[in-house]
Amino acid sequence: MAQVWKYYEIKDGKLIRKKKVCPRCGSFMAEHKDRYHCGKCGYTEWKVERPKIVIHGATIE
């Protein structure tokens, strides 16, 4: 069992989640070096903006 009590803190009498929560399904997201990822639904959020490549006026992300 993961030490789930480490994922929460009590502030002003309210329970606050320390980890990022998935906007799609509501479970905790795993924190990786360059992204946050939800193992339950597969949602991924990148920490840094990826550079955009412009070739002949067309933008590739």
Curated annotation (Swiss-Prot):
Cofactor names from the entry are: Zn(2+)
Sequence positions that bind Zn(2+): 22, 25, 38, 41
The record lists its disulfide bonds as none
Q: Which Pfam families match?
A: Ribosomal_S27
InterPro entries attached to this UniProt entry: Ribosomal_eS31, Ribosomal_eS31_arc, Ribosomal_zn-bd
Molecular function as annotated in GO: structural constituent of ribosome; zinc ion binding
Q: Name one GO cellular component term.
A: ribonucleoprotein complex
Protein's name in the database: Small ribosomal subunit protein eS31
What species was this sequence derived from?
Nanoarchaeum equitans (strain Kin4-M)
